[in-house]
Amino acid sequence: MQTVFITGANGFIGSNLCRYFLKKDFAVHGLVRKTSDLHFLEGLKVKLIYGDLNEAEKIELPQNLDYIIHCASEVSDMADTKSCEKNIYQATVNFMNHILKSKINMKRFIYISTSLVLGYGKLQISEENPGKPAKFPYVKYKIKTENFLQELRNSHRIPLVILRPADVYGPYDRTSSVPILKGIEDGYPVIVGGGKWIFPFCYVDNLSQGAYLACITPDIEGKAYTLTNDMDVTWKEFFSVFLERLNKKQRVYIPVFLPFVIAFLMKVINFFVPSFERRLNRYRVRRITSHTNYDISKTIKELNYKPDKDIQKQYQAIMDWYLAEKKAGYLK
């Protein structure tokens, strides 16, 4: 039986990776903090390894690891420089130093980055055709971490593969899916400018498939692959399926200029009242008011990647999870 070690195993992406690899008959080890909420891992045969990447030298790594998938990360376009440097870049440096000192003989190290390192606001974005640069700290330190890992691959022959998923959604997603569904239930889903812009969605099982293929495909060390659903879906289309499932109607469409005004006012308030939680910034407005998709032909060709495009099935899986979480009292 092959063994995979997944960092951030209790999170949205990490827990879905655990499920996927268990179904593929892998022995799954998951890194979690002692203070972590382990609800998403309940009932799964995951061997928990307790530790913190900021104290990576204390992590007891199994010696018989075949694959490591590093997805633990700060994940927010609102996160500040200090948090991103610590929890994206430095955490990875610490982890890799510990792996090298532990002399882990792994077959592949998979780093979960983001498609935003290639930019946004353009169609068919790729390394050869980059989009508008995303300049906030989250992306800055994802790029810096990718570069560090590539340097380490060259100097220490780390069998590295980088995955760059677009905007990930699916069951166990409390960050985006839950607020959207709550908004719809409460009767105020807001769509800007008619929701006509294409958005680069990536269902979490498609990300998991990409991670699995990145583990087993030979001769791809040092390469990076972008992951999406390979479908052009607009915000309006994305919302419409959830609206239909919840028997709701879209009531509010707001003009494009208004979110920019709101984002500016939130920035001003946050400047004078740092404790104020900003829910909107100029980047988020630009994302939902410009077309973005990515060219994944390289991923399809080299990994034999076949993304699931059954959005009805995907949305039903999200709905089933969401309603079960509400019934169990995990969501207020």
Please annotate each region the language model reported.
Residues 122-168, 189-192:
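Catalytic helix-loop patch of NAD(P)-dependent Rossmann-fold dehydrogenases
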Residues 37-42, 46-91:
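NAD(P)H-binding glycine-rich loop region in Rossmannoid oxidoreductase-like domains
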Residues 294-302, 306-332:
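Amphipathic terminal alpha-helices
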Residues 144, 173-179, 193-215, 222-223:
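Substrate-positioning beta->alpha
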Residues 204, 240, 264-306:
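Conserved C-terminal active-site "lid" loop/helix of NAD(P)H-dependent oxidoreductases
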Residues 213, 217-279, 316-319, 325-332:
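Mid/C-terminal beta-alpha module of Rossmann-like enzyme folds, strongest
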Residues 94-137:
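Conserved Rossmann-fold NAD(P)-dependent oxidoreductase catalytic core, especially the SDR/UDP-sugar
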Residues 4-24:
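N-terminal Rossmann NAD(P)H-binding glycine-rich loop of SDR-like oxidoreductase domains
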